[in-house]
Every structure is written in C-alpha cells, then in structure tokens.
C-alpha cells in the first residue's frame, strides 16, 4: 500500500480498455489526453489501483473533474494481477473483465484528432515527447 498525504492507493495490476479510445500527447507541456471518443483509436494499456475515498476526491480535483476530465466506469481486460492482499476468490483471472474508473475528456482541440494515437503513456517513451511540468515552462 502506498500512503499519500491525500489518501491511500494499492497497485493491483495492469489492464487494457475493452473499447478503443484515442490517447494523444498535446499542448506545450506534452500532456497525455484520453479523448472520450469510444470506438476510435487503440485499446489503452494502464495501471489498475484501488484507492480510498480521500484519494479519489483528490484525484477528481486534480483532474478538474467534472469540467475538464470526466471520471467514468470502463470495462478493463486484466493483463496481469498483482493484488497480493486479495483473497483467492477476489483475484480476477488474466483476460477477465472488470470495471474501473477512467479519466477521459470531451474538451479538446479538433486538431488533436490528427495527432498519433498511443496505446499507453510513458513520459520517457519512444515518442520523444517528454512531459514538462508547468513550473518548468514558465
């Protein structure tokens, strides 16, 4: 378990969206944006966490939810599960489907649809678009 000043999170594993979405890297800071356009783009790979209510409220605020990003339940295919605190009957099998909250946005520039679609985000990925913290731009 990881304890933050804003709540607690437990890494559970890796998953992939059942539905395709466009994941683009945009703006001056090279920010990853998951565009809420189901059926377009790629199946997105990401980490799965269990978070407490305190951290969930912090994340909503951090992501500008619901105005900038929207937190919606999405079907996620389990790629690998590492949740060691789960009882055997709570551990989802590989390739099974669970529902997780995902932050995506309907607020984007039309030209973002012409950007490359990524299947996952890594600030140091081979796309060469390293994330720039806001304070480093100013």
From Swiss-Prot:
**If you read the UniProt record, what top EC class would you report for this enzyme, in one word?**
lyase
| Keywords assigned | Lyase
E.C. no: 4.3.2.8
Report which reactions are catalysed by this protein: epsilon-(gamma-L-glutamyl)-L-lysine = 5-oxo-L-proline + L-lysine
Similarity remark: Belongs to the gamma-glutamylcyclotransferase family.
Name this polypeptide is given? Gamma-glutamylaminecyclotransferase
Q: Which residues form the active site?
A: 63
Recorded hits in PANTHER family, A to Z, give: GAMMA-GLUTAMYLAMINECYCLOTRANSFERASE, TROPONIN C-AKIN-1 PROTEIN
Give the highest taxon in the source lineage. Answer: Eukaryota
Encoding gene, per UniProt annotation? ggact
Q: What Gene3D superfamilies does this protein map onto?
A: Gamma-glutamyl cyclotransferase-like (3.10.490.10)
List GO molecular-function terms, semicolon-separated. Answer: gamma-glutamylaminecyclotransferase activity
From the UniProt annotation, give the residues forming the signal peptide. none
Q: InterPro entries annotated for this entry?
A: AIG2-like_dom, GGACT, GGCT-like, GGCT-like_sf
Task: Write out the GO cellular component annotations.
Answer: cytosol
Gene Ontology biological process terms, A to Z: modified amino acid catabolic process
Upper taxonomic lineage? Eukaryota, Metazoa, Chordata, Craniata, Vertebrata
Please give the function described in this protein's UniProt entry.
May contribute to degradation of proteins cross-linked by transglutaminases by degrading the cross-link between a lysine and a glutamic acid residue. Catalyzes the formation of 5-oxo-L-proline from L-gamma-glutamyl-L-epsilon-lysine.
Q: Which Pfam families match?
A: GGACT
Q: Which SUPFAM superfamilies match?
A: Gamma-glutamyl cyclotransferase-like
């Amino acid at each position: 378990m990881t304890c933050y000043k804003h709540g607690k999170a437990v890494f559970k594993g890796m998953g992939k969206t059942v539905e395709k979405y466009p994941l683009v890297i945009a703006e001056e800071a090279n920010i990853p944006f998951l565009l809420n356009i189901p059926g377009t783009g790629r199946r997105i790979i990401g980490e799965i966490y269990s978070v407490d209510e305190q951290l969930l409220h912090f994340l909503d605020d951090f992501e500008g939810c619901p105005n900038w990003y929207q937190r919606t339940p999405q079907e996620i295919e389990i790629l690998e599960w590492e949740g060691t605190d789960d009882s055997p009957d709570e551990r989802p099998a590989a390739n099974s489907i669970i529902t997780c909250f995902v932050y995506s946005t309907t607020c984007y520039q039309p030209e973002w649809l012409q950007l490359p679609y990524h299947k996952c985000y890594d600030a140091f990925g081979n796309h060469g678009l390293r994330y720039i913290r806001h304070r480093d731009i100013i």
